[in-house]
């Protein structure tokens, strides 16, 4: 098999690779918890945080009227509305309708949740939310994915289309297909389905180097839904990446084992049963059909389990569990371990299965790397330590995040968006695919532990007994997954004119998803002699083999047409309907969020308005109508908000907000203007006075032409005169503007909008200061000295001064302060009394 070099990021940040780079989102959809990791070009890998900044979210969706709730809040809602809190649905992925054993087990744990048949989906089941509303298993999973995608898009500031999904190693094709269809409902592209344990191995390898001799480790994943173990081989091989030869780390999954007997949920069920029996023994009340009480016991069992992972005892306490009776029970770690005594064998069962399939012994295993939330439970760790010795137990990966991080790195390697370090990753299928030839006869289409992408050939003998258009059912882990049909056998038989005919079919699996892929079907003819007409050139060309000139063909092969139909796959129409249903639900969520946001903003504004009503100084700037709105309408709107706000249209909420907000803004504008006006006016007058001082003392220096260059003297005087005129015109216009408007402004009432605004004063003062500074620069500029006869051209060039550029570090205030105190005092007389004489001087400056 030709191996492709897959690449994993080791850099502290991702490197931009091409112009159309896109983000990759890895989702670890777990039975109890979901995690997600985002890789975007230009930023390092990040765990996607929830709305509450948690690094993981419960895999739950709840419905409360038109409201859809996710995560911990959705799980907590089960104590009030147990029928509408959908959780732990990953346990149902291997179902084939309501008769499935898994469905029966699920409904015994969550009796309030109602399930119905759904023939349009792979899973075959839907959750009933109301008489008018139900959602398929695929749609429920898609909702959680969509929730995390929206969180990731907020982080990435862009749309996300590429996903990588983790799957337990024991997931068969049916379970994988359900996850893929959930992503298809969202119109997302799944780059890969990666084994949880292989993803952990990738994360484990990033900070380590390996020799050329294989090192064998076991990734042991004990989660909420199952416990699995995968034997992983780590070594270094020679290879090339980006055209360069280098040593490359290789990660190969060799074999896996699993059990459903040991999991976080199974331990929860033990605790729930123990607490339920304790309550019955003490009070004689059976809680088996009390849905709310069972949901509360479930929540408390989860809390107690977490406490006992770190402490020797915990107190289970639930107020008014049933019939007004409080429940309180002390549970020790030893009690929990006695409840789980029958799980000890299950703890090591996956390891034994994996080692047996890999043909390895414990002595060849370097370490057992623990992963998964349940791996923290002390009795699981102690059981493993007793079985394989404690020195081989390794806890050096993040038990919650290693899988999703490894999956994100793997996804980055499958795109062109990232510059990455090379790594060879080889995943395997964990159940054989069987091709049924009859009621009791079958052949292995793909053996167990076959690496992804590897081809496997099967041969069907006795061609004459299979018919003209034979169909062969295909199964994986006991579940029928599809039908393989040969189409043109009769035509091929005419070409293959020999007595010993066989049919060879080639199968493989998708290189990144582990899904079965039929490759080809051929008819072989061993030592057959062709009829004369097929010696001429019209014969069907063979795919393999060779021929000789005598007309005999050894191992001749002829292609056969085939079709492969997957069972239970959602039709395009069903996918469109599911996508439309989720889009409608998303729009309802957005409308609800917009409504809630409008209510919150109105409530905040009402509190502010009510505070302003008691501020007499603030109310001086309100006119009678505005005062009425503040005092009356704000109170009325508050009462309306409490009584009718949640049921009212969003438009009515925003209208009330706008009316009150506009009123407050108008009053606040006048209030702020009045507070800042005197300071701004004083600054403006000071700018006028400085300008007047410079303009009043304007003179034209006498530059002797026997000393200075005559042409440059004219240039300097012209620049100075132009600057003087610009400053003078600005001064004259601003002085006149202030004279025309100041009295009117000062006579307006506080409840009227000001005639002169603070922003105008500040802008005019700024412009005056800029022109004053420019004039000072021109005043300090000197003409060139007259060149001496015989002076070198280089000295003349060195003395050249740029026409429009004069570099001087003098600040405007420094230059202005250099004006004599006497001149400054003269200029402080009335600012509005001199413009006429100054204007005449400004006009005269044109003659300079």
Curated annotation (Swiss-Prot):
<feature type="glycosylation site" description="N-linked (GlcNAc...) asparagine">
    <location>
        <position position="247"/>
    </location>
</feature>
<feature type="region of interest" description="Disordered">
    <location>
        <begin position="784"/>
        <end position="848"/>
    </location>
</feature>
<feature type="glycosylation site" description="N-linked (GlcNAc...) asparagine">
    <location>
        <position position="632"/>
    </location>
</feature>
<feature type="compositionally biased region" description="Polar residues">
    <location>
        <begin position="829"/>
        <end position="840"/>
    </location>
</feature>
<dbReference type="GO" id="GO:0034663">
    <property type="term" value="C:endoplasmic reticulum chaperone complex"/>
</dbReference>
<dbReference type="InterPro" id="IPR013126">
    <property type="entry name" value="Hsp_70_fam"/>
</dbReference>
<feature type="glycosylation site" description="N-linked (GlcNAc...) asparagine">
    <location>
        <position position="457"/>
    </location>
</feature>
<dbReference type="GO" id="GO:0005783">
    <property type="term" value="C:endoplasmic reticulum"/>
</dbReference>
<keyword id="KW-0067">ATP-binding</keyword>
<comment type="similarity">
    <text>Belongs to the heat shock protein 70 family.</text>
</comment>
<dbReference type="GO" id="GO:0034975">
    <property type="term" value="P:protein folding in endoplasmic reticulum"/>
</dbReference>
<dbReference type="GO" id="GO:0016887">
    <property type="term" value="F:ATP hydrolysis activity"/>
</dbReference>
<feature type="glycosylation site" description="N-linked (GlcNAc...) asparagine">
    <location>
        <position position="134"/>
    </location>
</feature>
<keyword id="KW-0143">Chaperone</keyword>
<feature type="glycosylation site" description="N-linked (GlcNAc...) asparagine">
    <location>
        <position position="733"/>
    </location>
</feature>
<protein>
    <recommendedName>
        <fullName>Heat shock protein 70 homolog lhs1</fullName>
        <ecNumber>3.6.1.-</ecNumber>
    </recommendedName>
</protein>
<keyword id="KW-0378">Hydrolase</keyword>
<comment type="function">
    <text>Chaperone required for protein translocation and folding in the endoplasmic reticulum.</text>
</comment>
<feature type="glycosylation site" description="N-linked (GlcNAc...) asparagine">
    <location>
        <position position="488"/>
    </location>
</feature>
<dbReference type="Pfam" id="PF00012">
    <property type="entry name" value="HSP70"/>
</dbReference>
<dbReference type="GO" id="GO:0005788">
    <property type="term" value="C:endoplasmic reticulum lumen"/>
</dbReference>
<feature type="glycosylation site" description="N-linked (GlcNAc...) asparagine">
    <location>
        <position position="555"/>
    </location>
</feature>
<dbReference type="GO" id="GO:0000774">
    <property type="term" value="F:adenyl-nucleotide exchange factor activity"/>
</dbReference>
<dbReference type="InterPro" id="IPR018181">
    <property type="entry name" value="Heat_shock_70_CS"/>
</dbReference>
<feature type="compositionally biased region" description="Polar residues">
    <location>
        <begin position="807"/>
        <end position="822"/>
    </location>
</feature>
<keyword id="KW-0732">Signal</keyword>
<feature type="short sequence motif" description="Prevents secretion from ER">
    <location>
        <begin position="845"/>
        <end position="848"/>
    </location>
</feature>
<feature type="signal peptide">
    <location>
        <begin position="1"/>
        <end position="21"/>
    </location>
</feature>
<keyword id="KW-0547">Nucleotide-binding</keyword>
<dbReference type="InterPro" id="IPR029048">
    <property type="entry name" value="HSP70_C_sf"/>
</dbReference>
<feature type="glycosylation site" description="N-linked (GlcNAc...) asparagine">
    <location>
        <position position="678"/>
    </location>
</feature>
<keyword id="KW-0256">Endoplasmic reticulum</keyword>
<dbReference type="InterPro" id="IPR043129">
    <property type="entry name" value="ATPase_NBD"/>
</dbReference>
<feature type="glycosylation site" description="N-linked (GlcNAc...) asparagine">
    <location>
        <position position="817"/>
    </location>
</feature>
<feature type="glycosylation site" description="N-linked (GlcNAc...) asparagine">
    <location>
        <position position="462"/>
    </location>
</feature>
<feature type="glycosylation site" description="N-linked (GlcNAc...) asparagine">
    <location>
        <position position="359"/>
    </location>
</feature>
<dbReference type="GO" id="GO:0005524">
    <property type="term" value="F:ATP binding"/>
</dbReference>
<keyword id="KW-0325">Glycoprotein</keyword>
<dbReference type="GO" id="GO:0140662">
    <property type="term" value="F:ATP-dependent protein folding chaperone"/>
</dbReference>
């Amino acid at each position: 098999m030709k191996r492709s070099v897959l690449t994993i990021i080791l850099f502290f940040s991702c490197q931009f690779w091409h112009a159309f780079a896109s983000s990759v989102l890895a989702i670890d959809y777990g039975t109890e918890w979901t995690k997600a990791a985002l890789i975007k070009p230009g930023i390092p890998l990040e765990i996607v945080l929830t709305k509450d900044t948690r690094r993981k979210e419960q895999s739950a969706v709840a419905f409360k009227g038109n409201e859809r709730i996710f995560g911990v809040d959705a799980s907590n809602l089960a104590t009030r509305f147990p029928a509408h809190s959908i959780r732990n649905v990953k346990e149902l992925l291997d179902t084939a309708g309501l008769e499935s054993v898994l469905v029966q087990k699920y409904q015994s744990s969550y009796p309030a949740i109602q399930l119905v048949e759904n023939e349009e989906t792979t899973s075959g089941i839907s959750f009933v939310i109301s008489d008018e509303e139900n959602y398929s298993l695929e749609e429920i999973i898609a909702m959680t994915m969509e929730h995390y995608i929206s969180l990731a898009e907020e982080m990435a500031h862009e749309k996300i289309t590429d996903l990588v999904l983790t799957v337990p190693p024991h997931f068969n094709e049916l379970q994988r297909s359900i996850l893929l269809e959930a992503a298809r409902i969202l119109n997302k592209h799944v780059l890969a389905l990666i084994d949880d344990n292989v993803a952990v191995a990738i994360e484990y390898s990033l900070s380590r180097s390996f020799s050329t001799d294989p090192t064998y480790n076991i990734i042991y994943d004990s989660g909420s839904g199952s416990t699995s173990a995968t034997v992983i081989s780590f070594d270094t091989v020679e290879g090339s990446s980006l055209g360069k030869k280098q040593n490359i780390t290789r990660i190969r999954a060799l074999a896996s084992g699993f059990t459903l007997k040991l999991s976080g949920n199974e331990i929860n069920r033990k605790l729930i049963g123990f607490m339920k029996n304790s309550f019955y023994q003490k009070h004689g009340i059976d809680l088996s059909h009390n849905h709310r009480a069972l949901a509360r016991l479930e929540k408390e069992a989860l809390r107690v389990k977490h406490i006992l992972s770190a402490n020797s005892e915990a107190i289970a306490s639930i107020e008014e569990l049933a019939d007004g009776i409080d429940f309180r029970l002390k549970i020790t770690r030893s009690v929990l371990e006695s409840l789980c005594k029958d799980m000890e064998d299950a703890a090591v069962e996956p390891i034994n299965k994996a080692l047996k399939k890999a043909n390895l012994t414990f002595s060849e295993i370097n370490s057992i790397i623990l992963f998964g939330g349940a791996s923290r439970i002390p009795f699981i760790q102690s059981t493993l330590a007793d079985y394989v010795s404690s020195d081989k137990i390794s806890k050096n990966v993040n038990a919650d995040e290693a899988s999703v991080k490894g999956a994100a790195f793997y996804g980055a390697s499958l795109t062109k968006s990232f510059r990455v370090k090379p790594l060879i990753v080889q995943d395997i299928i964990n159940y054989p695919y069987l091709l049924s030839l009859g009621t009791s006869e079958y052949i292995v289409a793909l053996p167990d532990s076959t690496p992804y992408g590897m081809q496997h050939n099967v041969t069907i003998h006795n061609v004459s007994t299979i018919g003209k258009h034979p169909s062969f059912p295909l199964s994986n882990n006991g579940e029928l997954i599809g039908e393989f049909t040969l189409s043109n056998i009769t035509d091929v038989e005419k070409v293959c004119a020999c007595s010993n005919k066989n049919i060879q079919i080639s199968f493989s699996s998708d290189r990144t998803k582990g899904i079965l892929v039929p490759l080809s079907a051929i008819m072989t003819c061993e030592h057959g002699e062709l009829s004369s007409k097929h010696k001429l050139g019209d014969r069907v060309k063979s795919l393999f083999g060779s021929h000789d000139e005598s007309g005999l063909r050894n191992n001749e092969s002829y292609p056969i047409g085939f079709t492969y139909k997957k069972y239970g796959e959602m039709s395009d129409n069903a996918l469109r309907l599911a996508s439309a249903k989720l889009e409608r639900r998303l729009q309802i969520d957005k409308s609800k969020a917009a409504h809630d946001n409008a209510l919150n903003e109105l409530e905040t504004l009402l509190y502010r308005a009510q505070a302003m009503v008691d501020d007499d100084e603030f109310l001086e700037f309100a006119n009678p109508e505005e005062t009425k709105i503040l005092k009356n309408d704000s109170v009325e709107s508050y009462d309306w908000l409490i009584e009718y706000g949640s049921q009212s249209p969003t438009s009515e909420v925003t209208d009330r907000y706008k009316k009150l907000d506009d009123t407050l803004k108008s009053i606040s504008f006048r209030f702020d203007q009045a507070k800042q006006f005197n300071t701004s006016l004083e600054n403006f007058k000071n700018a006028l006075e400085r300008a007047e001082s410079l303009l009043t003392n304007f003179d034209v220096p006498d530059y002797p032409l026997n000393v200075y260059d005559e042409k440059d003297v004219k240039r300097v005087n012209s620049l100075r005169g132009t600057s003087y005129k610009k400053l003078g015109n600005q001064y004259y216009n601003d002085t006149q503007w202030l004279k025309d408007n100041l009295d009117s402004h000062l006579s307006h009432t506080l409840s009227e909008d000001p005639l002169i605004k603070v922003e105008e004063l500040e802008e005019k003062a700024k412009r005056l200061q800029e022109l004053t500074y420019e004039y000072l620069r021109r005043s300090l500029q000197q003409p060139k000295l007259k060149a001496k006869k015989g002076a070198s051209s280089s000295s003349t060039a060195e003395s050249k001064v740029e026409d429009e550029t004069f570099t001087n570090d003098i600040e405007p205030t420094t230059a202005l302060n250099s004006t004599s105190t006497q001149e400054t005092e003269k200029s402080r007389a009335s600012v509005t009394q001199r413009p006429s004489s100054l204007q005449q001087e400004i006009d005269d400056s044109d003659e300079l």
